Design a protein with these regions (language model features):
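A contiguous, basic/glycine-rich beta-loop/short-helix subdomain that forms a polymer-engagement track
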Residues: 239
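Short glycine/serine/threonine/alanine-rich loop segments
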Residues: 236
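His/Asp/Glu-rich metal-coordinating catalytic cores
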Residues: 1-47, 56-222, 226, 232-233
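Conserved G/P- and acidic residue-centered "switch" motifs that form tight phosphate/ATP-binding loops
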Residues: 52
Length: 239
């Protein structure tokens, strides 16, 4: 995921600089693994804003020259730094992980609901609900136009309803350009359950079986909360 925003005066920003995700068991290959390609992409760029810490949104941070300022949310920075530190234990990933950790030391941490100006482009960072905690969308003002870049989002998380109300409030301001994700566009009638429903199902299974083993992302805070609350509520009802 990479979006380029350039003003008529030449200010150029990127929203996300991610790597392709693996397809099943295969190794992920990306156009920007080639040094010449990423150098061409970054030519003239002054700032890069990351919406969240998933690898298809941040994956080339170590390849970015020091003169380009990289920005991410404070909690997202902690999460990606923790992930890269764990990668240093794998011999095949160690070298790149240390390069990434060095780059992360130079990151700027943006705050939610803050508007800042970079050259002649302004960006307001707005929190959204996603499986990555501290995910953000961006309200961008450039050349008299307004752009809403939603990043990845969902409405079935714990803060989904509030997030959609926020999006509606910005769309009501006559957005000129909407840039959004399309994760579910290729799926026919996807059946999604909410975190509340998942928590209830988990509690039922915990009541049914003596032992339960959970397999989920350790970086999905909503999901961890769902299983914690299911276990807590199950134990509370047994007292």
């Amino acid at each position: 995921c990479i979006t380029e925003i350039e003003s008529s005066k030449g200010t150029k920003l990127l929203i996300d600089l991610g790597h392709n995700l693996p397809d099943g068991e295969s190794i992920a290959h990306d156009l920007y693994d080639e040094k010449s390609n990423i150098e061409t992409l970054l030519d003239g760029v002054s700032h890069i804003f990351y919406s969240h810490y998933h690898s298809d949104h941040i994956g080339f941070e170590s390849k970015v020259p020091d003169k380009i300022q990289q920005h991410i949310g404070s909690l997202s920075l902690k999460m990606i730094r923790n992930l890269r530190e764990h990668m240093t234990y794998a011999d095949s990933l160690k070298e790149e992980a240390y390069k990434s950790l060095s780059a992360l030391e130079r990151f700027d941490e943006y705050e939610s609901n803050k508007r800042k100006v970079y050259g002649d482009i302004s960006i307001t960072t707005l929190p959204v609900s996603h499986s990555a905690i501290d995910a953000h969308m961006f309200f961008i003002e450039c050349d008299g136009k307004t752009i809403l870049h939603t990043g990845d989002f969902r409405d079935n998380g714990y803060n989904g309803k509030e997030m959609f109300e926020e999006i509606k409030s910005y769309i009501s301001q006559s957005i000129d350009i909407l840039i959004t994700e399309g994760t579910l566009l290729s799926r026919n009638n996807p059946k999604m359950i909410t975190e509340y429903q998942l928590k209830e199902k988990a509690e039922q299974l915990l009541n049914k079986y003596k032992y339960a083993f959970v397999l989920c992302s350790s970086m999905d805070a909503d999901r961890l909360c769902s299983f914690f609350k299911a276990s807590h509520d199950r134990d509370t009802k047994r007292r």
